[in-house]
């Protein structure tokens, strides 16, 4: 199965999702433009609603009610993808990752939800900041889009 997310906002780009079956990892690839230099939190959020910009996307997709964590952590939100790294505004930021928790299949699938690029680095739930266990203290939302099935 394949899906696509067209990111818009201060940051824009295309992110593709591909998964051969429910038992296989999810491949996430694509690019972003106009992303400031540094690390930026990258998460699937609970709602596929961008009617009020990225704020209407809700919180991180967390159907299992876990604390926020790194993509490879045992305890994490389903929607936690960690950070993406940008070389700066004038560069293309490539995205290429695999995830073993997120899926395009089953009751916790991400189809119809939103993908959000954040202003700040995701601390992966590892700091004492009050937002660390809920958002990774990753700040505001630079861009977002709705994940949709594609050919």
Swiss-Prot record:
Catalytic activity: 2 superoxide + 2 H(+) = H2O2 + O2
Family: Belongs to the Cu-Zn superoxide dismutase family.
Binding locations of Cu cation: 43, 45, 60, 118
MF GO annotations: copper ion binding; superoxide dismutase activity
Binding site for Zn(2+): 60, 68, 77, 80
EC numbers: 1.15.1.1
CDD domains: Cu-Zn_Superoxide_Dismutase
Keywords of this entry: Antioxidant, Copper, Disulfide bond, Late protein, Metal-binding, Oxidoreductase, Zinc
Gene3D superfamilies: Superoxide dismutase, copper/zinc binding domain (2.60.40.200)
Domain of life of the native organism: Viruses
Cofactor note (record): Binds 1 copper ion per subunit. Binds 1 zinc ion per subunit.
Lineage of source species: Viruses, Viruses incertae sedis, Naldaviricetes, Lefavirales, Baculoviridae
Disulfide bonds: 54-144
Protein name: Putative superoxide dismutase [Cu-Zn]
The keyword rRNA-binding appears for this protein: no
Known role: Nonessential for normal virus replication. Could be either non-functional or with a low activity.
Keyword Chaperone: no
Cofactors (names): Cu cation; Zn(2+)
């Amino acid at each position: 199965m394949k899906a696509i997310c067209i990111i818009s906002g201060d940051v824009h780009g295309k992110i593709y999702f591909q998964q051969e079956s429910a038992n296989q990892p999810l491949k996430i690839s694509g690019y972003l433009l106009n992303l400031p230099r540094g690390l930026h939190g990258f998460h699937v959020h609970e709602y596929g609603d961008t009617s009020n910009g990225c704020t209407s996307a809700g919180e991180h997709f967390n159907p299992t009610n876990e604390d926020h964590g790194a993509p490879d952590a045992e305890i994490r939100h389903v929607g936690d993808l960690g950070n993406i790294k940008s070389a700066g505004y004038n560069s293309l930021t490539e995205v290429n990752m695999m995830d073993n928790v997120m899926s395009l299949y089953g009751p916790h699938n991400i189809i119809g939800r939103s993908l959000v690029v954040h202003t700040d680095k995701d601390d992966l739930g590892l700091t004492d900041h009050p937002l660390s266990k809920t958002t990774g203290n990753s700040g505001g939302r630079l861009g977002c889009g709705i994940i949709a099935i594609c050919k």
